[in-house]
């Protein structure tokens, strides 16, 4: 259990199957049973403490470290991450900021990482330090991608004109990236990366 102030407590009963145990620290508790060894929870705790950034990323890094250190001695099957934040759900309708799970897969933590990447793409917020100006080579590249995807019929001029803007806005809306849309001449680099990778 970890309370709202980051104080943690855990209990491992004597009837758990080896290896079983836990480590608690400020803002976290790592525990398990039927693990390969104590190395699993030690790796999780160490990684959580040393990783910076958002909680969801730290949790995923800890899960990955635990698996790399041996994990469950029966193998892999499922993984999940739940992070709650007041009003943090889609459009603020609930508090489930991140609620992802893989119930049955040979590499569930890898699958969970893929789901988190998609979650951040579609529901993440634009970083104001991660914007690209749409002009010159960037504008031309966007126009070429929009031609390939059928959103734009004009020439690749490198000018961010109204026709290009409308085509880009349509693309962003159809791809469900409208939460990252800006109405000026700046583009979230996540959108540009998505366009380059997929199209």
Where are these regions (language model features)?
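N-terminal nucleophile
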Residues: 1-131, 136
């Amino acid at each position: 259990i970890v309370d709202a102030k980051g104080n943690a407590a855990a209990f491992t009963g004597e009837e758990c199957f080896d290896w079983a145990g836990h480590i608690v620290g400020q803002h976290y508790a790592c525990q398990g049973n039927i693990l390969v060894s104590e190395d699993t929870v030690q790796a999780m705790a160490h990684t959580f403490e040393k990783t910076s950034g958002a909680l969801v990323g730290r949790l995923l890094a800890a899960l990955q470290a635990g698996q790399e250190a041996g994990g469950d001695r029966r193998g892999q099957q499922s993984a999940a991450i739940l992070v709650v934040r007041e009003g943090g759900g889609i459009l603020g309708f609930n508090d489930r900021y991140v609620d992802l799970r893989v119930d049955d897969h040979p590499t569930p933590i890898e699958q969970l990482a893929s789901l988190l990447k998609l979650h951040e793409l579609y529901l993440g917020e634009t970083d104001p330090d991660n914007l690209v100006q749409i002009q010159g080579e960037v504008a031309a590249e966007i126009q070429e991608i929009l031609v390939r995807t059928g959103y734009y019929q004009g020439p690749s001029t490198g000018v961010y004109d109204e026709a290009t803007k409308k085509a880009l806005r349509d693309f962003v809306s159809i791809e469900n990236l409208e939460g990252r849309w800006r109405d000026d001449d700046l583009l979230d680099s996540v959108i540009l990366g998505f366009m380059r990778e997929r199209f």
